Amino acid sequence: MKNIIKATIVLGAAALLASGCIKETFPTGSTQTKDQVSKQPSAIDGLLNSIPAAMVTTGTAGHLSSYNVHYDFGIGAIHMATEFMLEDIATLGDNPGYNRFYVWCLNQAQGDTYISCAYFWDCYYPWIKACNDVISLIDPETELAQSQSQLGQALAYRASFYLDLARLYIPKENKYIPIPDEIKELTVPIVTEKTSEQDANNNPRAKRSDMYEFILSDLALAEKLLAGKSLGYNTPNLGVVYGLMARAYLEMGADGDEGAYEKAITYADLAISTSGKTPLTQSEWQDPVNGFNNGAANNSWLWGIGCTSENFNNIGCQAAMLCCEGQWGYAPLSQLGLNKATYEKIKDGDFRKASWLDANAQAHAPLAGSAADGKVFLYGNEDLQIPAAKPYESIKFRPAQGNCTNYTVGNAIDAVMMRVEEMWFIKMEALAQSGKLPEATALLKQFMDLRILDGSYSTAKLGDLDSFIDEMFFQKRVEFWGEGILIFDYKRLDKGITRGYEGTNHPLVWAFNCEGRSPQWNIVITRGEYQSNTAIVNNPDPSQFTKNWTGAE
């Protein structure tokens, strides 16, 4: 591995420290600001396009330049960080410090004084600022189709960002760290195109009900503006708006809002019918060229964010961290894979199981690249400093174009934002939670027949709500492994994590377990915000809320 020089990692109860040198190249793309554009639709396009560009650009939060952290690459990094707070991504490499998200794995440095705490905030709020800049330039009563489309997209982006923030930062009860009464039901401050600097300095966290009212108002206007507009998967189109509504109403239903589950069902159906999208086929899922890296190559993705060589460097991007078949970056060294216990529970006839190597480190789906590239992945290469593949290692996310050797090609993967399969699961959960368990069970059976193709999947043992939710949740974990949406399911459904068990393939340094939801999922607000915004009351620091599993329990 010629792009990586050997590093030494010290693993201990108190710290995980990495030292090493990595040669980097830097992106050359640029963005525009509100002051640099006029109110002409053609000029606003550049400002609008800067939003998705910022979402996948190396160094987007300023943490790479300020702190030299290599996980600063935007929405893909946020998705990975949240996945590492869960249980299903195991770091299999001999040196787990090559997983640059180790602070989230360890549940260390999650308090307000740490850069890891600040990362989500330092991504989302600048992106929201870019949305506000576009929104401020367009009259919502405009009759120009291009302007309507631009405003609708900006509103949908903003709603998506606030929906993520609301779900990440709202403190939920757990068995480890009490939630003070003063912060219950609080999300994050709302900043719009009309918020002054003075207002921002005394801007309290919005109550849950107020935040969802704001999000849904943005989406309602976006729905109106985007109706009849033909937009591709790489921007929030009308189907995406309905998908975001379905996500929001599912959360509201879980929080007890009357009628919310029924609306979640309605909007999930609308997202499916409006988009015309269908679940991935086996050939699309296992495609060694386009698998989970190219939304244009399938009929499943409602939304994905494209990435070009202008947006990334050689190691600071999602592919370099996640695509294990690539011969550069951290992925072939951290060797991310599936939790062994989860793998063993997946039925052998489920074609998704081939997303990971088996217990003997053998592949059951085509490998990316040439036959020689496949040998490098499976058996390693001393000259390239690439180790042999590990049991349960991932081949779900392929390098772009199946290119395993050239990072300027292979790193240009799309970030998946929404697949139609999620709408199926939203509908299932909402049906079950609203007292329609037989319909929910039938829908799960219908979906699983698209994954276990011989029709042998059975729901006979799912006769009550709890057993159904457990099974649906497990299948959703398998379906969306690594895609960055599962933290919201864990948090909403009050599910725990199990990394420590006999035979675990998680590094013991972060093999902790928790019963029910983890306090780590109540993200702490960065000190930079509450020092400037006097109205902030923060979430408690969850760092190291429990001890690691030692094998004695």
Q: Residues of each region from the PLM?
A:
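Flexible, polar/acidic helix-loop-strand segments at domain edges
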Residues: D348-R419
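Conserved, well-structured interaction surfaces
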Residues: G93-Y169, A206-D210, A220-L231, T408-A415, ...
